[in-house]
From Swiss-Prot:
Signal peptide: none annotated. This is ATP-dependent protease ATPase subunit HslU. GO terms for cellular component: HslUV protease complex. The gene is hslU. Keywords: ATP-binding, Chaperone, Cytoplasm, Nucleotide-binding.
């Protein structure tokens, strides 16, 4: 768990997301409170619950990106799910407890990668020995092995083809799940794990070059050095204490007064979410997982429904509300120029690979922002995603002809932008008259 201060968290988020200070402050405080909770004694720590957040704002203004960057910053298990993908228990579809199972799987991957990094040096040594075994055999004299080891380290044997044994992907299969009881499994029937341990696991022969074999063998050797049970325990603890769940499109399961039909199932999904958000225990194949301290961030545009249309009990479990504002022309301009991996920087780097130097004038950036604002106002407001449509249209010719223009420079000005997006604006005007 990172110990960034709220100010440092907001500063880090500012590198990738423009504006939305209220939302950034809310998630920064929530993350810092997790660190504060870890400093408490055990008795009080269990009593401190996370303050779940409800983000309200149109699409494309940064709701998902704020949550994703927050999880990356914290090094925490993170899952993003659409609330509309789930159905009430008893209906065909995924049940909400699958969210927690997915979170634990993400935790397993995070912990495994972390542990692999710790044993990488030892795994690399073991991988080198296996490459030497494949090159000279296991019975070669020490002098021969040392001679080949020097050549190996000097990259003289990189292109030589060898055959190595590696563990089959997925050979330590999970237990059989009981129909109708997701997450529960029958330990007695976990045959692949039993036989895998008894027989040393299933392997397959792979033909590859010496250079490419290292990636396979280092992973293989790393997994041999890891304790799977320890990884599972750590992953469950990480999911329980540091997990972040982003519930998108929560407004789509809000039932308006007088609604019938699908509203019944939507209300059922809300009722199924209640215990998950409040705190319950979910059965997974890695053991029971408590959701008491998982941070839930719900979001929705709420164009039709209102936050008050959610079940009162669910509203009470989302105590912190932040509204994200729609993006202005100045915001679009800053998105194009100030963010860490801005679109302009991305396109410049992509075309540099073809030897084309791309340059945008200040008035071109203004024109791009202006067009994006107009299209959002006239068609559908999709926020910052509109910039991708505009940029693709403006740079269509340059991207297509780039292989033939190596060594040349291309300057994009306001006139160039208007010339290339004029038909886009014309199509927009016509679209208003199409049913």
């Amino acid at each position: 768990m990172s110990n960034f201060s709220p100010r440092e968290i907001v500063s880090e988020l500012d590198r990738y997301i423009i504006g939305q200070k209220d939302a950034k402050r809310a998630v920064a405080i929530a993350l810092r409170n997790r660190w504060r909770r870890q400093q408490l004694d055990d008795e009080l720590r269990d009593e401190v619950m996370p303050k779940n957040i409800l983000m309200i704002g149109p699409t494309g203004v940064g709701k998902t990106e704020i949550s994703r960057r927050l999880a990356k910053l914290a090094g925490a298990p993170f899952v993003k799910v659409e609330a509309t993908k789930f159905t009430e228990v008893g209906y065909v579809g995924r049940d909400v407890e699958q969210i927690v199972r997915d979170l634990v799987e993400v935790g397993i991957s995070l912990v495994r990668e972390k542990r692999r990094a710790e044993v990488k040096a030892k795994a690399h040594q073991n991988a080198e020995e296996r490459v030497l075994d494949a090159l000279v055999g296991t019975t070669a004299s020490p002098a021969t092995r040392d001679s080949f080891r020097k050549k190996l380290r000097a990259n003289e044997l990189d292109d030589k083809e060898i055959e190595v044994d590696v563990a089959e992907a997925g050979s330590p299969g999970g237990a059989f799940e009981i129909p109708g009881m997701p997450g529960a499994n029958i330990g007695v029937l976990n045959l692949s794990e039993m036989f895998g341990k008894a027989l040393g696991g299933r392997t397959k022969k792979v033909k590859t070059t010496v250079k490419d074999s290292y990636a396979l063998l280092v992973n293989d050797e790393s997994d041999k050095l890891l304790d799977n049970e320890q990884i599972q325990r750590e992953a469950v603890a990480a999911a329980e204490n540091d997990g972040i769940v982003f519930l998108d499109e929560i407004d789509k399961i809000a039932t308006r007064e007088g609604g019938i039909g699908a509203g019944v199932s939507r209300e059922g999904v809300q009722r199924d979410l209640l215990p998950l958000v409040e705190g319950t225990t979910v059965a997974t194949k890695y053991g029971p997982v408590k959701t008491d301290h998982i941070l839930f961030i719900a979001s929705g545009a709420f164009h039709v429904a209102k936050p008050s249309d959610l079940l009162p009990e669910l509203q009470g479990r989302l105590p912190i509300r932040v509204e994200l504002r729609a993006l202005t022309k100045e915001d679009f301009r800053r998105i194009l120029t100030e963010t860490e991996a801005s679109l302009i920087r991305q396109y410049k780097a992509l075309l540099e690979t073809e030897g084309v130097a791309l340059d945008f004038t200040e008035d071109a950036i203004d024109a791009l922002a202006e067009v994006a604002v107009q299209l959002n106002a006239n068609v559908e407001n999709i926020g910052a995603r509109r910039l991708q449509t505009v940029m693709e249209r403006v740079l269509d010719d340059v991207s297509f002809n780039a292989p033939d223009r190596g060594g040349q420079g291309v300057t994009i000005d306001a006139e160039y932008v208007r010339r290339h997006v004029g038909d886009l604006a014309a199509n927009t005007d016509l679209s208003r008259y199409i049913l």
